[in-house]
C-alpha cells in the first residue's frame, strides 16, 4: 500500500535474521535488572511473558514482509554473521513454535514457582529465557559451530533448571544425572563435528554439502565416498543428537530427570529442547549431509532408532505407576514417531521434513496441556502417582476431559490432530520405502492405549476422597489454550499443513 513503510525498510535485512533473538535477549536483560530492584517478583512474570509474545509477533510481522518473502523465494533469505544465522521459512516456523512453548510454560508455572521457588522466583524465568534463546539459535543456524553453541546454551541452562529446587533431593539428583550424561553427549557431538570439518574443510552446512557432493581433500576426488572419518563423524553426530531427543539407546537419562525435575521444567523439557534438537537434526542431516550416497545410510540408522524408541518407550510406559515417569517414556516413544519423519526426509525430503514440523507442533501443544494438569496436581498435593488422579472427573471436570482429549490425540485416534500428524508421518515413511516402519508406528500407537487408558479409567471410574482442586488461573488458561490449539489444528489443519510444506521446501 502507498505510504506504508515495510519492515525491511526500517531494519537492516541482516538484523531481521536475529530480531526475535534480540528481543528475547533484551527481555532477559530487562528481567535481570528489574529483579534486582523490584520486591514484587510476581509482576515480573508478565514482563517475561510479554517479551516472549513480542518476539512471536516480530516473527509474524517479519515473515509477512513482501520484500523478505521475495528474498526467501529467490534463495536469498536474510542472513547474519555472514550466513551463520539465517531467516528462512524453516527458521520462522520453528522459532514461532519454540516461543509458543516458552509462553505456555511461563503461564502454567506462575503459581508453582510462587509456591515452591520463593528464593529463586525470577531465576526460573531468566533461565527459561536463556534456554529459549539457545533453542532459537539451534534452529536458525546454518553452521555446525553456531548449532553447537546454541545447543550448549540450551543444555547448560537446562542442567540448572532441572536442579532449581535446591533443597529437594530428587531435583538435585536429576540435575546431576542430566549434567553428567549431557556433558558426555555434548563432547561426543563436538567430536563428530570436528570429524565432519576434517573431512569437508568447512563447518558451513552448504559448503559441507558441496564438499561431499564434489569431493574434498579427504573425500575421494572422483566423487562422494563413505570414508572411515566421515562414517565416524556421522555416527558421533547421531549419538549426540540422539541423546538430546531422548532416543533409544541413549534415553536412560530422561525418566529420572523428568521425574526429579520440577513439573513445569519437565513440561518444558518434553517439548522445547526436543523440538529444537529435531530441527537441528534436519538442518545438519538434510542441509549438510543430504547428499547421495550418504542419505540412505543415515536415514536407515534414524529409522532403526525410531523403531527402537517407539517400542521401548511404549512398552516400558505400560509398567509405570508414577505419571511423570510414564510421560517420560511416552516422550521417548513420541521422539521415535518424529524420527520416522527424519528417516523419511532422507529420500522424500520435503514430505518428510513437513511431517516432522507438523508433528512437533501438534505434540508440543498437546503435551503442554497434559503437563499443565500434572503441574496443578503436583503443586496442590504432591500428587504424581496415577492413583492420585482417582475421581478427577468430579474434582475438576475441565482437567479430566482435557486430559482425555490430549491422550486421544497422542494415541492418534481420528479425527484429532495427533491422528493427522501420525498420518503424515506414515505417508512419508511409506513413500520413502519404510513401510515396515510405518506399520510398526501403527502397532505402537495401539500399545500406547494401555497406559493412557489406565489414567482415564482412574479419572472417570474410580472413587476418591481427594478434595477438589484449588483454582489456578495460569494453569487453567494454559489448559484452555492447549485445548484451543488441539481443536484448531484439527479443524483448520490445511493452512498449517501448507505452512509446514512451505517451510520444508525452503529449508537451506
Curated annotation (Swiss-Prot):
NDH-1 shuttles electrons from NADH, via FMN and iron-sulfur (Fe-S) centers, to quinones in the respiratory chain. The immediate electron acceptor for the enzyme in this species is believed to be a menaquinone. Couples the redox reaction to proton translocation (for every two electrons transferred, four hydrogen ions are translocated across the cytoplasmic membrane), and thus conserves the redox energy in a proton gradient. Its EC number is 7.1.1.-. One of its GO terms (molecular function) is quinone binding. One of its GO terms (biological process) is ATP synthesis coupled electron transport. Pfam families: Proton_antipo_M (PF00361). Its main location: membrane. It comes from the Bacteria. It catalyses: a quinone + NADH + 5 H(+)(in) = a quinol + NAD(+) + 4 H(+)(out). It comes from Symbiobacterium thermophilum (strain DSM 24528 / JCM 14929 / IAM 14863 / T). Belongs to the complex I subunit 2 family. HAMAP family: NDH1_NuoN_1. NDH-1 is composed of 14 different subunits. Subunits NuoA, H, J, K, L, M, N constitute the membrane sector of the complex. It is found in: Cell membrane. It is a multi-pass membrane protein. Disulfide bonds: none annotated. One of its GO terms (cellular component) is plasma membrane. Keywords: Cell membrane, Membrane, NAD, Quinone, Translocase, Transmembrane, Transmembrane helix, Transport. This is NADH-quinone oxidoreductase subunit N 2. The chain crosses the membrane at residues 14-34, 43-63, 90-110, 119-139, 144-164, 179-199, 223-243, 275-295, 298-318, 327-347, 353-373, 400-420, 433-455, 473-493. The keyword Cell cycle does not apply. The keyword Transmembrane helix applies. It is an enzyme of class 7 (translocase). The gene is nuoN2.
Amino acid at each position: 500500500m502507498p505510504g506504508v513503510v515495510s519492515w525491511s525498510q526500517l531494519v537492516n535485512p541482516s538484523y531481521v535474521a536475529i530480531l526475535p533473538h534480540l528481543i528475547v535477549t533484551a527481555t532477559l536483560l530487562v528481567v535481570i535488572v528489574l529483579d534486582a530492584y523490584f520486591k514484587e517478583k510476581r509482576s515480573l512474570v508478565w514482563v517475561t511473558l510479554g517479551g516472549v509474545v513480542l518476539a512471536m509477533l516480530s516473527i509474524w510481522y517479519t515473515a509477512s514482509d513482501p520484500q523478505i518473502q521475495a528474498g526467501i523465494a529467490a534463495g536469498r533469505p536474510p542472513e547474519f554473521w555472514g550466513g551463520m544465522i539465517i531467516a528462512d521459512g524453516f527458521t520462522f516456523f520453528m522459532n514461532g513454535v519454540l516461543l509458543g512453548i516458552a509462553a505456555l510454560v511461563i503461564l502454567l508455572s506462575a503459581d508453582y514457582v510462587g509456591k515452591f521457588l520463593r528464593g529463586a522466583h525470577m531465576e526460573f524465568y531468566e533461565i527459561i529465557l536463556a534456554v529459549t534463546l539457545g533453542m532459537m539459535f539451534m534452529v536458525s543456524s546454518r553452521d555446525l559451530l553456531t548449532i553447537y553453541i546454541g545447543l550448549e546454551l540450551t543444555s547448560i541452562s537446562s542442567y540448572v533448571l532441572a536442579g532449581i529446587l535446591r533443597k529437594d533431593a530428587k531435583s538435585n539428583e536429576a540435575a546431576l544425572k542430566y549434567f553428567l550424561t549431557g556433558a558426555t553427549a555434548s563432547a561426543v557431538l563436538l567430536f563428530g563435528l570436528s570429524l565432519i570439518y576434517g573431512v569437508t574443510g568447512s563447518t558451513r552446512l552448504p559448503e559441507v554439502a558441496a564438499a561431499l557432493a564434489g569431493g574434498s581433500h579427504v573425500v575421494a576426488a572422483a566423487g562422494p565416498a563413505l570414508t572411515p572419518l566421515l562414517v565416524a563423524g556421522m555416527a558421533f553426530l547421531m549419538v549426540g543428537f540422539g541423546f538430546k531427543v531422548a532416543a533409544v539407546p541413549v534415553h536412560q537419562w530422561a525418566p529420572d530427570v523428568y521425574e526429579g525435575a520440577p513439573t513445569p521444567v519437565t513440561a518444558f523439557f518434553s517439548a522445547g529442547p526436543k523440538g529444537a534438537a529435531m530441527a537441528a537434526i534436519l538442518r545438519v542431516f538434510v542441509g549438510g549431509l543430504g547428499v547421495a550416497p550418504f542419505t540412505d545410510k543415515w536415514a536407515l540408522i534414524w529409522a532403526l532408532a525410531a523403531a527402537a524408541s517407539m517400542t521401548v518407550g511404549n512398552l516400558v510406559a505400560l509398567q509405570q505407576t508414577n505419571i511423570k515417569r510414564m510421560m517420560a517414556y511416552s516422550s521417548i516413544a513420541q521422539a521415535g514417531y518424529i524420527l520416522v519423519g527424519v528417516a523419511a526426509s532422507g529420500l522424500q525430503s520435503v514430505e518428510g521434513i513437513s511431517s516432522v514440523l507438523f508433528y512437533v507442533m501438534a505434540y508440543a501443544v498437546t503435551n503442554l496441556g497434559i503437563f499443565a494438569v500434572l503441574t496443578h496436581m503436583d503443586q496442590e498435593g504432591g500428587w504424581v502417582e496415577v492413583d492420585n488422579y482417582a475421581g478427577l472427573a468430579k474434582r475438576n471436570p475441565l482437567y479430566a476431559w482435557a486430559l482425555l482429549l490430549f491422550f486421544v490425540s497422542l494415541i492418534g485416534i481420528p479425527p484429532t490432530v495427533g491422528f493427522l500428524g501420525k498420518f503424515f508421518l506414515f505417508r512419508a515413511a511409506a513413500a520413502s520405502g519404510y513401510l515396515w516402519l510405518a506399520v510398526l508406528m501403527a502397532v505402537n500407537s495401539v500399545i500406547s492405549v494401555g497406559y493412557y487408558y489406565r489414567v482415564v479409567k482412574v479419572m472417570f471410574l474410580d472413587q476418591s476422597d481427594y478434595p477438589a482442586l484449588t483454582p489456578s488461573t495460569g494453569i487453567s488458561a494454559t489448559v484452555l489454550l492447549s485445548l484451543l490449539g488441539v481443536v484448531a489444528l484439527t479443524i483448520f489443519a490445511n493452512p498449517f499443513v501448507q505452512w509446514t510444506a512451505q517451510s520444508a521446501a525452503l529449508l537451506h
